[in-house]
């Protein structure tokens, strides 16, 4: 069956549905990598700048959208910056299991099936629940690659169903503070 459009799952309705031990047939998380680029601590210490893609509205982002955004950003940065010159992390994990009450969708199906009110549905996918101000993507880089990082995040944001913003700042000193905060 085809995948329903993202507008069907963008808004949060009800409590999270995450307990896999009670869900039979829950789909696997189809995001193979959460860390891209240079992942060694020694190499990351040479990157003085940080970029964050931050979500502005509460909602759900399906794992297909997260994977598409991750691929867009990673491929662009690999092509124009090189794997050794950046670190990129996808910060959210799609734990919430989406349900779908499948209905017949063909000519004359209205006479065959009327459905059921408030039907529970069967597992159909996964999504990450996000809140305003939550970081979706985190990147470390050198100042000369700032334009490429912004473009990669812009391309990744075009694959997501919620509005986002890009924040660029100097890397902190390890205790959660940035260099400009003192």
Curated annotation (Swiss-Prot):
Keywords in alphabetical order: Ribonucleoprotein, Ribosomal protein
InterPro entries for the chain: Ribosomal_uL16, Ribosomal_uL16_arc, Ribosomal_uL16_CS_euk_arc, Ribosomal_uL16_dom, Ribosomal_uL16_euk_arch, Ribosomal_uL16_sf
Gene Ontology MF terms: structural constituent of ribosome
Gene Ontology BP terms: translation
Entry-linked SUPFAM superfamilies: Ribosomal protein L16p/L10e
Cellular component, GO annotation: ribonucleoprotein complex; ribosome
Superkingdom of source: Archaea
Pfam family, one: Ribosomal_L16
Record-stated family: Belongs to the universal ribosomal protein uL16 family.
HAMAP family in the record: Ribosomal_uL16_arch
Name of the protein in question: Large ribosomal subunit protein uL16
Annotated source species: Pyrobaculum arsenaticum (strain DSM 13514 / JCM 11321 / PZ6)
């Amino acid at each position: 069956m085809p995948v329903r459009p993202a507008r069907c799952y963008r808004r949060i309705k009800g409590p999270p549905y995450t307990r896999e031990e009670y869900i039979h047939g829950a789909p696997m998380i189809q995001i193979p990598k959460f860390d891209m680029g240079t992942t060694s601590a020694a190499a990351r210490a040479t990157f003085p700048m940080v970029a964050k893609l931050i979500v502005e509205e509460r909602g759900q982002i399906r794992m297909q959208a997260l994977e598409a955004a991750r691929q867009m950003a990673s491929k662009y940065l690999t092509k124009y910056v090189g794997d050794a010159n950046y670190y990129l992390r996808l910060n959210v994990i799609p734990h919430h299991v989406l349900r779908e009450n499948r209905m017949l969708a063909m000519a004359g199906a209205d006479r065959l099936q009327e459905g059921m009110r408030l039907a529970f549905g069967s597992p159909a996918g996964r999504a990450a629940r996000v809140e305003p101000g939550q970081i979706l993507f985190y990147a470390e880089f050198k100042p000369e690659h700032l334009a490429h990082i912004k473009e990669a995040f812009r391309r990744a944001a075009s694959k997501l169903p919620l509005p986002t913003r890009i924040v660029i700042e100097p890397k902190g000193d390890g205790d959660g503070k940035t260099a400009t905060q003192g």
